[in-house]
Amino acid sequence: MNLDTLDRPVKAVVLRPISVRRRIKNNVATMFFFTSFLIALVPLVWLLSVVVARGFYAVTRFDWWTHSLRGVMPEEFAGGVYHALYGSLVQAVVAAIMAVPLGSMTAVYLVEYGSGPFVRVTTFMVDVLAGVPSIVAALFIFCLWIATLGFQQSAFAVSLALVLLMLPVVVRSTEEILRLVPDELREACYALGIPKWKTIVRIVFPIATPGIISGVLLSIARVIGETAPVLVLVGYSRSINFDIFDGNMASLPLLIYTELTNPEYAGFLRVWGAALTLIILVAGINLFGAAFRFLATRRCSGCR
């Protein structure tokens, strides 16, 4: 090969300019998608602005986070949502304690062990459960736990209903994360003679843990604002109740529903303050899950 040919600069190739018709189509499509984005964004911004404007005064009071409504008259704007915030967190955490092991083990079976028609049936049932309304889950727990077994209305009954709502989210998120673990790692363990169960416990689960925890936090954020279970399965209390198996227990959705019937201006402030508190709580859980996933992924990348 002649070296002069290699040293010779490459001639610029003049591409055919984009036609006016294609430019118009591209601009129209861009404007269409941008307009759709704005249409979807306007209700969200409107909702947040209204809730923040009407609930900001309530949440900026120190008593709002440290006191309950025990002894507070309906027309008196005093006390706070400490009891309702505690109830929402306890009900969601108890539900997560039951739903996470069951959902994670179900996902492990579907990914690592399952095959045949039983897996398809299980997957179909998980999809059906994901579409079940919260009121149906609440009525099922009411019929089983209260009407049939004879237990009283309590926060634990609410947690049982929340388990039904959390399970499909935990199963699906864990299943997707487990499928992202490279099969080469499993095959390397099998080649070394490591049993399958030990491969799952020692290799697959540690790698998938950040994603699983993020999915769990998303499922908690998904159910912590559900209203139907608390309306059906537990009564409202203006003071804090530490017993999840007996007595009424307040929660943020139940407080909002109860204070809606209060005609006083104090009830108006409590409704919007509780709504803003619930938004802050859900946003905080989502941000914590995103930050945890980012830090865990960054640490794993640095270890390579």
Curated annotation (Swiss-Prot):
Compartment list: Cell membrane
Residues covered by the ABC transmembrane type-1 domain: 85-289
Gene Ontology cellular component list: plasma membrane
Major subcellular location class: membrane
Record carries keyword Transmembrane helix: yes
UniProt keyword terms in alphabetical order: Cell membrane, Membrane, Phosphate transport, Transmembrane, Transmembrane helix, Transport
Any one of the GO BP annotations: phosphate ion transmembrane transport
Topology in the lipid bilayer: Multi-pass membrane protein
Function: Part of the binding-protein-dependent transport system for phosphate; probably responsible for the translocation of the substrate across the membrane.
Family: Belongs to the binding-protein-dependent transport system permease family. CysTW subfamily.
The protein, known as: Phosphate transport system permease protein PstA
Organism listed in the record: Mycobacterium leprae (strain TN)
